[in-house]
Structures are given as C-alpha cells and as structure tokens.
Design a protein with these regions (language model features):
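MFS transmembrane alpha-helix packing/gate-lining sites
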Residues: 29, 58-65, 115, 146-150, ...
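Helix-loop-helix hairpins in multi-pass membrane proteins, especially solute transporters
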Residues: 71-204, 230-231, 305, 321, ...
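Interfacial helix-cap and linker-helix signal at transmembrane-aqueous boundaries
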Residues: 40-41, 72-73, 157-165, 219, ...
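Transmembrane core module of solute transporters
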Residues: 12-61, 166, 203, 217, ...
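C-terminal module of multi-pass small-molecule transporters
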Residues: 77-86, 95, 100-103, 107, ...
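C-terminal membrane-cytosol helix-exit motif in multi-pass small-molecule transporters
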Residues: 136, 175-194, 209-221, 238-253, ...
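Flexible interhelical linker loops that connect adjacent transmembrane helices
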Residues: 5-6, 182-209, 251-266, 327, ...
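Intrinsic disorder in cytosolic terminal tails and internal cytosolic loops
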Residues: 1-11, 194, 456-476
Length: 476
C-alpha cells in the first residue's frame, strides 16, 4: 500500500503530512487547556497564579529547551529527535491526564514542554532540507497554517472533551495520536543531520533556562508576594543577569547554542521579533478571553470553544494563501498588515461589556483570523528563507523559541495586569477592569510588531537565503 501511495515525486508532501501531524499535537496543547481551566480550577482547587503555571509551565519549558532541541536535531538526526520528542510528549500527556493535584499537573505539563521542544525545531528543519526553495514557502505556509489551526482549534476541542468527557481527556487524546505519529515518522521521514558534530552548549542552556524561568516567575507571582518584595525583585535581577551572561557566553563559545551570526540578517531579526510580539500579544488573549466567555458571559466549555470557530475557519483558508503570497511578493507588508489587524482586534476586544452577545464578538474573531494568518505564516517563511540549510535546525528553533517565550511572557504579563485589578473575592467589575487594561496593552504590543516588521524585514526577503539552501537541496 505504501508503495502505491508514496512515490519519489510525492514523498516530500507525505513527509510534510507526517511533520504536520506531530506539530498539530504539540501546538494544540498551547490552547486546548484554556477552556478547561475553570473545570481544572474547581476539581484541583487551584488559584489564578497556579492556572497560569499550567499554561506557562508548558510554554516556558518549550521555549527554554527549544534551542537545544534544534541543536540536537541538526547533530544527531532530525527524524530521531522528532520521534524521541513525540515519545516524551505522549508519556507526559498520559501523566497530565492522571494528575490528581495542581502540582502534579504542572510537573507533567513541564515534561510535555520537554518533548515539544525536541519536536518543534525538527519540524521546520525537516521541511527546509526536504523542499527546494521554490516550494518552501508553500510548505512552510502549510506548516504555519497547521500551527495556527491547532492554536485556534484548541478551545473548541478542549470544550468538547471537557463537557462531554472530562478535562483529563484533553491530555489522554494525545496518547493514540502520539503512537500513530511515531509510526508515520519512521515510514515517511528520511533521516538527515548536520555532519559537523558540534558539542552541546550546556552553559548556554543553563543560563537561558534560568533567565526565562526567573522572568516568568517574577511576572506570575508578583501580585502574590508584592512587586517590591525581595523574592520578586530578586527574580528579575536573576533574569537580567542570567540572560546577559547567556549573550556574553554565546559570543565566546566555539559551538554556541544560539548562533548570533544569524542576527546579522535584518530580515531574520525582523521575522523573529514579529513572531515574539504576536505571541506576546495573542497567547494571553486566548487565555483570558476563554475565562471571560465562561466566567462573565456564562458560556459552557463547548460554547466558548465554538465561539473561536470563525477565526479557525479563516486560518484554515488563509494561512496557505499567505504562504504563497509570501513566496511571490515577500513577507514584509503581509506581516505588517496582519499585525495592524491584530492591534485593531485587541482594541475592539478591550471595549467589550459584561453582557456582549456572540455577534458583538464576531468582528474581532474575524479580524483575528486574518491577522494570525497574515502574521505567523509569512514570519515563518521569511525567517527560514534567511538561513542556510545547515543552520535550519537552530534557525527554526530560534523562531519557535521566540513564539514560546512571547507566549509564556504574554500570559504572565496579562495575568499580572489582571491580578492588579482583581478584588478579593474577585467580582465581575474588577475582572472587566483588568481585562480591558490587559487588552489595551496587548493592542499596543501588536502595533509595535507592525512597526518592527515594516522597519526590519526587507521588501524582497523571498530571495534571501535561497542560494545556500538551493545548493544543498540540489546536492542531496
């Protein structure tokens, strides 16, 4: 059967399908928990800051280990690292579903992040070595569309499973998917690696991981302990020192975890900053809009998930088209326009009342569908066109780390803003006060992303990085 379905001509598309299958699973877990949070909170008796850790623990570990995951993929084999990542993620998903306390759930979510950090950079680097430059934008468009689709479908799938089974099943469902993903990877993905065999940068891993953890900890726990407390000020000092030491170390390492020469290309810098800022603005929105729909508007878990469908459908339709448009015209104005749309969406959301109907929400959801598609797909395509094929693993790891750092920081930042306005006990009025301020801040962040993209990404970025990748593809 495989011989009839998979040929030399179409194998690269089957490879893309296998990669997208695994990618969908790990990206889904960024947002699938959002509509289940009220149920998790009730059953496990968790506070708001603990709920933030359920989401941020995954995103933070994902981000902190992403660069090392890219290095592992390039050095030891992209398929091997991808498959090992699926196995870790699958086992951690089982542990999440079996968790009987908030602490156990957070620990299992951290383990999920380890698996995801191995899988995600391998997906883009597999695409980079599989597709020639003329098709890479389309392939990355499908990749980015899959990622955005998973993020958008997460609330709906989470709502259906939470309401008709239990919150545990948002994690249990990953187990059969993971097993199928491992089988598909061995059948459909060819092994590839960078033969330079550079050693791992453990000091870089330690300092970057500590810095990101300290930053997120300070933002999430600031309201609990006081922003001027020794604990929180100390966390921010540790974050600043650790991240500064990380950059200094990377400049001196013979085989750095983060290849700083990548940032000599301003298009690559612009694409990564755009990805970081869109995640910073949007991940917190998914988190708190889900809470708003259920705790303020009275939506059920399924209704809250279904409310995101207009955005989901638009992402399905537009993300691949955005990839093709990026191939033809470059990414600069697509990203800029997408970020402007997201800024308008967030400003609109900030003006919602505590009795808004779905039809009032709809314009913002439509804007979000267009904005996410026009931003995430072209950002990914621009970044990967700007790196040579031998740097594909670390190049994609940096891009995805920016998204996850932005996501975990965004949730922490929006949570800190919300918590600063919540009364004890929380009231609808205090929730709406914090909700409005958080979304205004998110809108400003999205607008900053538009300005960044317009200033840094070259108008004809489609040509950058094509030659080295083309030569490598032809040599293969």
């Amino acid at each position: 059967m495989r011989a009839r379905l998979v040929t030399e001509e179409n194998k690269k598309w089957w490879t893309l399908a296998a990669v997208a299958f695994g990618l969908f699973m790990i990206m889904l877990d960024n947002t699938v928990v959002n509509v289940a949070l009220p149920s998790i909170q009730r059953e496990l008796d968790m506070q708001l800051s603990e709920l933030e850790w359920v989401v941020s623990g995954y995103a933070l570990t994902f981000a902190a280990l992403m660069l090392i995951g890219g290095k592992l993929a390039d050095a030891y084999g992209r398929r091997l690292v991808f498959v090992v990542g699926i196995a870790i993620f699958t086992l951690a998903s089982l542990a999440c579903g079996l968790a009987s306390s908030g602490e156990a759930l957070i620990a299992a979510r951290v383990a999920q992040g380890v698996g995801a950090a191995m899988m995600n950079p391998a997906t883009l680097s597999i695409i980079a070595v599989t597709f020639p430059p003329r098709q890479r934008g389309t392939a990355i468009g499908i990749w980015a569309g899959t990622s955005a689709l998973a993020l958008a479908l997460g609330p709906l799938i989470g709502g259906l499973l939470t309401e008709h089974a239990s919150w545990n099943w948002i994690f249990f469902v990953n187990v059969p998917i993971g097993v199928l993903g491992i089988a598909a990877s061995f059948l459909l993905i060819d092994e590839s690696r960078d033969e330079s065999h550079e050693r791992l940068d453990l000091p870089g891993l330690a300092t970057s991981g500590l810095g990101l953890f300290a930053l997120t900890y300070g933002l999430i726990e600031g309201n609990n302990f006081g922003w001027g407390s020794v604990r929180i000020v100390g966390a921010f000092v540790v974050a600043a020192v650790s991240l500064t030491v990380f950059v200094l170390l990377e400049r001196r390492q013979r085989a750095p975890m983060l290849d700083l020469t990548l940032f000599r290309n301003r298009t690559y810098v612009g694409a990564n900053l755009a990805m970081l800022l869109v995640a910073l603005a949007m991940f917190g929105v998914f988190f708190f809009v889900s809470l708003y729909m259920q705790n303020v508007l009275g939506y059920s878990a399924v209704e809250a998930g279904a409310a995101f469908l207009p955005m989901t459908v638009l992402i399905i339709l537009i993300a691949p088209l955005a990839g093709r448009a990026s191939d033809r015209w470059g990414s600069r104005w697509l990203i800029t326009g997408g970020m402007v749309l997201l800024a308008v969406q967030l400003a609109y959301f900030s003006q919602l009342s505590d009795d808004a109907t779905f039809w009032v929400l709809l314009p913002a959801l439509v804007l979000g569908g267009f904005g996410m598609s026009m931003t995430m797909t072209p950002s990914s395509a621009a970044a990967m066109r700007a790196v040579p094929v031998e740097k594909a693993g670390i190049g994609s790891a940096v891009l995805n780390a920016c998204r996850q750092v932005g996501g975990s920081t965004g949730i922490a930042l929006m949570g800190a803003i919300m918590a600063s306005r919540l009364t004890s006990p929380p009231t609808t009025a205090s929730f709406m006060d914090g909700f409005e301020l958080a979304l205004v801040v998110a809108s400003v962040i999205a607008l900053a992303g538009a300005i960044t993209a317009a200033a840094l990404i070259r108008p004809h970025d489609r040509s950058h990085g094509a030659e080295p990748v083309q030569q490598a593809a032809e040599a293969a």
